[in-house]
C-alpha cells in the first residue's frame, strides 16, 4: 500500500486538476452563451439571403446566359478540382470536436478522389492545420486565430480568395465543412456546397413556381452580385460563429466530465488515505503494545 505522503501528493494534484477543469467549464459556459446569441442573430439573416438567392437562381436556370455571373449557378459545370474549406478549433480540451471534423474532411477527400477529382484544402484552425501538416498533406491556405475570434471582415477575405479561384477556373466547386452547434450536449457536422449555388426544386408554394418573374435588366447583374456577395460572406461568417459555439459546448462537456472524474478519483484517494492511515495507526499501536509486553 502506498505511504501517506505519496497519497497526500496525489490528492493535492487531483484536487488542483478539479479546480482547473471546473473553472474552464464555467468560462466555456459564459462564452457559449455569447456565441449562441451571436449565432442566433446572424442565422436568420443568412437564411433569408440564402432563400432569396436560391429562388432567383432557380429562375435563372431558364435563361442563364443572360447574366454575367452565370457561372455561380451553373450546376452542370464539369468538376475536376474541388476546394474544401474546413473549420477546426485553435485549442484542444474539447472532446472529439476536432477529431470529428477532421474525420469528415478525410471522408470527403476520399469521396472526391474516388471520382478522380483533385482536392485542395483551405484550413481554418490550428488543430486541423497541425493534424494535416503532421500527415504530410498539402494545405493551400492556413488560417490561425480566425476560428477562436471570428471576424466578418476576415471571413470575407477567406471566402473571396476561394471565389476568385472559382471565377478564374482554378477550382470548379467550393465545399464548406464545420462542426456546428446542435444543443448543449451534442454537435452537428455540416457539409455545404457554396459554389455552384444549388437552386431548390420549384413548387406551387415557391415564388419561382408561382408568380415570381425575374427579368434581366441593366441592374440585374448588380442585384445578383450583391446577393451572392452577402450569401457567401454570411455563409462563411456564420460557419465560424456556429463552429465556435459548438467548440465551447464540447469543451464545457469535456471539462464537466473531467471534473466528475477528478471528484471520483478524489473519493478513491481519500478512501485509500484513510485505510493507509488506519493501517499505520494499527501498526503503531501493535508496536507500542509489543514493546510494553517485552518490558514486563
Curated annotation (Swiss-Prot):
Could you name the domain of life of the organism this protein comes from?
Answer: Bacteria
Q: Which GO terms describe its molecular function?
A: ATP binding; proton-transporting ATP synthase activity, rotational mechanism
The protein in question is named: ATP synthase gamma chain
**Does this UniProt record's set of keywords contain Transport?**
yes
Q: Which PROSITE patterns match?
A: ATPASE_GAMMA
Q: How does it assemble?
A: F-type ATPases have 2 components, CF(1) - the catalytic core - and CF(0) - the membrane proton channel. CF(1) has five subunits: alpha(3), beta(3), gamma(1), delta(1), epsilon(1). CF(0) has three main subunits: a, b and c.
What is the protein's membrane topology class? Peripheral membrane protein
Q: What Pfam families does the entry give?
A: ATP-synt (PF00231)
Q: What role does it play?
A: Produces ATP from ADP in the presence of a proton gradient across the membrane. The gamma chain is believed to be important in regulating ATPase activity and the flow of protons through the CF(0) complex.
Q: What is one GO cellular-component annotation here?
A: plasma membrane
Q: Where in the cell is it found?
A: Cell inner membrane
InterPro entries membership: ATP_synth_F1_ATPase_gsu (IPR035968), ATP_synth_F1_gsu (IPR000131), ATP_synth_F1_gsu_CS (IPR023632)
Q: Name one GO biological process term.
A: proton motive force-driven plasma membrane ATP synthesis
State the family it belongs to: Belongs to the ATPase gamma chain family.
The protein's UniProt keywords, in alphabetical order, are: ATP synthesis, Cell inner membrane, Cell membrane, CF(1), Hydrogen ion transport, Ion transport, Membrane, Transport
Amino acid at each position: 500500500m502506498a505511504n501517506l505522503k505519496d497519497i497526500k501528493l496525489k490528492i493535492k494534484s487531483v484536487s488542483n486538476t478539479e479546480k482547473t477543469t471546473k473553472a474552464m467549464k464555467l468560462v466555456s459556459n459564459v462564452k457559449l452563451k455569447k456565441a449562441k446569441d451571436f449565432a442566433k442573430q446572424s442565422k436568420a439573416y443568412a437564411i433569408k439571403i440564402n432563400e432569396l438567392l436560391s429562388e432567383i437562381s432557380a429562375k435563372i436556370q431558364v435563361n442563364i446566359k443572360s447574366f454575367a455571373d452565370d457561372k455561380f449557378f451553373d450546376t452542370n459545370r464539369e468538376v475536376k478540382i474541388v476546394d474544401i474549406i474546413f473549420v477546426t478549433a485553435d485549442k484542444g480540451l474539447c472532446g472529439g470536436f476536432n477529431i470529428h471534423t477532421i474525420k469528415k474532411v478525410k471522408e470527403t477527400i476520399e469521396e472526391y478522389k474516388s471520382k478522380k477529382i483533385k482536392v485542395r484544402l483551405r484550413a481554418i484552425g490550428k488543430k486541423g492545420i497541425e493534424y494535416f501538416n503532421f500527415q504530410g498533406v498539402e494545405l493551400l491556405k492556413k488560417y490561425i486565430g480566425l476560428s477562436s475570434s471570428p471576424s466578418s471582415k476576415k471571413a470575407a477575405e477567406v471566402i473571396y480568395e476561394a471565389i476568385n479561384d472559382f471565377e478564374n477556373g482554378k477550382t470548379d466547386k467550393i465545399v464548406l465543412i464545420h462542426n456546428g452547434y446542435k444543443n448543449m450536449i451534442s454537435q452537428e457536422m455540416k457539409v455545404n456546397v457554396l459554389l455552384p449555388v444549388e437552386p431548390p426544386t420549384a413548387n406551387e408554394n415557391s415564388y419561382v413556381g408561382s408568380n415570381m418573374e425575374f427579368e434581366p435588366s441593366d441592374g440585374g447583374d448588380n442585384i445578383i452580385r450583391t446577393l451572392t456577395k452577402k450569401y457567401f460572406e454570411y455563409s462563411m461568417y456564420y460557419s465560424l460563429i456556429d463552429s465556435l459555439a459548438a467548440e465551447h459546448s464540447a469543451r464545457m462537456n469535456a471539462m464537466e466530465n473531467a471534473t466528475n472524474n477528478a471528484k471520483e478519483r478524489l473519493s478513491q484517494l481519500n478512501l485509500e488515505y484513510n485505510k493507509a492511515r488506519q493501517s499505520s495507526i494499527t501498526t503503531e499501536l501493535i508496536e507500542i503494545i509489543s514493546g510494553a509486553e517485552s518490558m514486563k
